[in-house]
Design a protein with these regions (language model features):
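Mature exported/compartmentalized surface modules and terminal targeting/interaction regions
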Residues: 1-2, 7-10, 41-44, 48-120
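N-terminal leader/targeting helix
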Residues: 1-28
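Long compositionally biased, domain-poor regions of proteins
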Residues: 20-26, 32-33, 37-40, 48-52
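Short beta-strand-centered segments at strand-helix junctions
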Residues: 18-32, 77-87
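Short, surface-exposed loop/turn motifs at beta-strand boundaries within globular domains
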Residues: 14-16, 32-34, 42, 109
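Beta-strand elements of modular eukaryotic interaction domains
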Residues: 12, 28, 37-38, 104
Length: 120
C-alpha cells in the first residue's frame, strides 16, 4: 500500500525572536482574514494566538492595547512587539534573541486559536 504525501500533513511552525513571532504558511492560514490578534499563555505555558475579525475588534469590548497587528505575507505571517516578546521570554524563561527558536504549532478548531507548543 502507498502512503501519499499531502500538503495538509505539513506541520505549522512558529519562530520566536526577541522582537516578533513568525508563523510559516501552514500556521498562517487561519489568520488570513484576521484584523488583529490576541496573544497569551495557557496553563501549560504554551503560547496561544487568537485571530480577531474586524467586527470583533470594533465591538469595543476588548482592550485595544492588548490587540496586536498581524502582517500577512505570501509565505509567512508576523506579529511584531518587543514588549510581547519580553513578556514571553520572562514568563517562559526563553532566551530570545536574533537567533531563532522554532516550535511546532497546532490549530485548535474548537477554541478558534493557534497554540505554539513550547517543549522544554
Amino acid at each position: 500500500m502507498i502512503s501519499w504525501w499531502t500538503a495538509k500533513e505539513k506541520n505549522g511552525q512558529a519562530t520566536l525572536y526577541s522582537s516578533n513571532i513568525t508563523l510559516n504558511k501552514v500556521a498562517s492560514v487561519p489568520f488570513e482574514f484576521a484584523n488583529r490578534v490576541q496573544v497569551g499563555l495557557d496553563e501549560n505555558n504554551n503560547i496561544v494566538i487568537e485571530p480577531l475579525s474586524k467586527e470583533r475588534v470594533e465591538r469595543g469590548d476588548l482592550d485595544e492595547y492588548n490587540l496586536l497587528e498581524i502582517k500577512i505575507k505570501p509565505s509567512y505571517s508576523r506579529i511584531c512587539s518587543t514588549d510581547l516578546m519580553n513578556f514571553i521570554g520572562e514568563k517562559l524563561k526563553l532566551a530570545l534573541s536574533t537567533e531563532p527558536l522554532r516550535f511546532e504549532t497546532v490549530w485548535e478548531e474548537e477554541n478558534n486559536h493557534l497554540v505554539i507548543l513550547i517543549k522544554k
